[in-house]
Every structure is written in C-alpha cells, then in structure tokens.
Amino acid sequence: MKKWTIAASLSIGVLALSACNSDDEIVAETEAGNITKEEFYEELKDVNGESTLQQLVTVKVLEDNYEVTDEELEEEISTMKEGFPSEEDFNTTVEQQFGGEEQLREIMYVSMLQEKAAAEDVEITEEDLQELYERKNTEIQAQHILLENEEDVAEVQQKIEDGEDFGELAQEYSTDTGSAENGGDLGYFSAGSMVPEFEEAAFSLEAGEISDPVQSTHGTHIIKVNDVREKEESIGEFEDVKKELEREILLNRVDQTQIQEKINKLIQDAGVQINVEGMEDLFEAEETEENTTEEDAQG
C-alpha cells in the first residue's frame, strides 16, 4: 500500500503540471539550462506513469463499488493506536514507516476498500466466528517436527508409531532450528500465532494426540499437543471483538491473487478508457495476461 501512496503523490504532481497553461512553463532553473513543465511531465510519465495510472483507476473503480466511511477509518486508526504504549510511540512509528498519519490514512483507506471487495465473495458464518473466539480464549502447548521431504516424513511417522520419543525425533529430524534443540517445543500459543494450516490442525487435537502430516508454506509438520487450557485473560466480549474476528477469518481465506483477480474484473466491467498517448492499452494488456494465466491453469 505504501507504493500506492507514493504513486498517488506523484500523480498529484503530474495532474498539477498538466493543469498549467503552458508546456513551456519553467519548473526549475539552473545555470546549465532550464527544465520545462513538459519535460518534467514526460519524465514523470515515463518513469511512474503506468503504475500511477493503474493505482488511480483502481481506487476510482473500488470507490464506485464500495464505501469506507470516516467512522470506519477512524475506528481502524484507533485500533492501531491501542497497540502502542503511547500516542507518541504511535506517531513516531507512523512517521518513520509511512511519512505521517495522513499517508497512513490513505493506505488504510485503500486497504479497507480492497477488503470489502474480497469480503463480497467470502461467506463467514456465526459458527466460524464463535469457533475462532473460543480458540483465541484457549491456548495450547505443542511440539512439532518440520520436515522437507517425503522420505523423512514417512520415516518419522513410522518411528512415532513404533513408540519412539517425539522430542528426540524432533532433535534429530526437524529443520526448524528455533525449536528442534528443545525437542520441537513451541510453548503455549493461541489462535493467530501460527500459519493457518498449522493452527487448524493443532487446535483440532486433544492433549496427547499427534497429527497426520500437515502441509504449510514452511514445509511438512507433524504436531503433538501436550496441553490445552483456557487463557487467564479473555480477549473480550464476543460482540465487542466480532468485527476483528471476521477480518482475521477473511484474511486467512483470501490471498492477494484472489483480491487482484476481483479488482481486475471490476476494472474490466467499468469500461475504462485511457486517453494518455502510449498507455491506451494499459488495462487491455492486464486482461490478456489474466486470460493467458487462466488458460495455462486449465491446460
């Protein structure tokens, strides 16, 4: 999203320049020669023009289909502030990472528009929310063995079935250097701490149970749960945290590729016409690329 902010800032400059009356207007003077508005505009267009225009059109199309209210944006910013020890810490971090709160608001605004587009195709039931709420009020203590190839998976599974010690197997086989030397011990954790595939498997186990192999972006896990207990401090009343739970489920179920495909479809349906010389086919190229990807997947 930072990229969008930079692009948007550049586009403001480009639009301001294009609004000037004369292409010969001087925007910079040097002893070596002057730089005209036209030269500056053409350079900005050549370097950042396509990405800037793509981002501006994307935001315009999203705004035509979805709405993020001032109240929603304020609530989001307030929630972020609660995660910092003080408002001064929040302001310092925001200044360092985003260039200021105004830039952060722009980023959050576009992010929330994208989330609304993604949420349209995802069904989240009351049961889903209740299940996540219960998990977040529960913590489990587990060990795991992370493996990289099928041969090791089969070998470790067999040794577990033969009764060998799980911790010793983790020390011998696990590629997770952070936990292997401790017998694969991950300590206590609650929902939202691990990758979704791992978490789903771990929270489905009772104390003392060992999972089947679980695939994640890190490799193949074999998980053993040793203890399940209620957290000492609740995350809050269900109705108070319901919106946060819904967002977490949404982000776990939708990846960036799916969001981009949805946005591309909205842009296609919006009948976008580009009137900048050299960029007339900007979104047609995106559409062709998307269709090619779909054909490759089907083939």
Curated annotation (Swiss-Prot):
Membrane topology: Lipid-anchor
Signal peptide: 1-19
Lipid-bearing positions (N-palmitoyl cysteine): 20
Subcellular location: Cell membrane
Enzyme class: isomerase
GO BP terms: protein folding
Gene3D superfamilies with a match to the protein in the record: 3.10.50.40
Entry GO terms, CC: plasma membrane
Entry's EC annotation: 5.2.1.8
An example molecular function term from Gene Ontology annotations: peptidyl-prolyl cis-trans isomerase activity
Main location: membrane
Family the UniProt entry places it in: Belongs to the PrsA family.
Function, as annotated: Plays a major role in protein secretion by helping the post-translocational extracellular folding of several secreted proteins.
HAMAP family membership: Foldase_PrsA
Protein name: Foldase protein PrsA
Organism, scientific name: Oceanobacillus iheyensis (strain DSM 14371 / CIP 107618 / JCM 11309 / KCTC 3954 / HTE831)
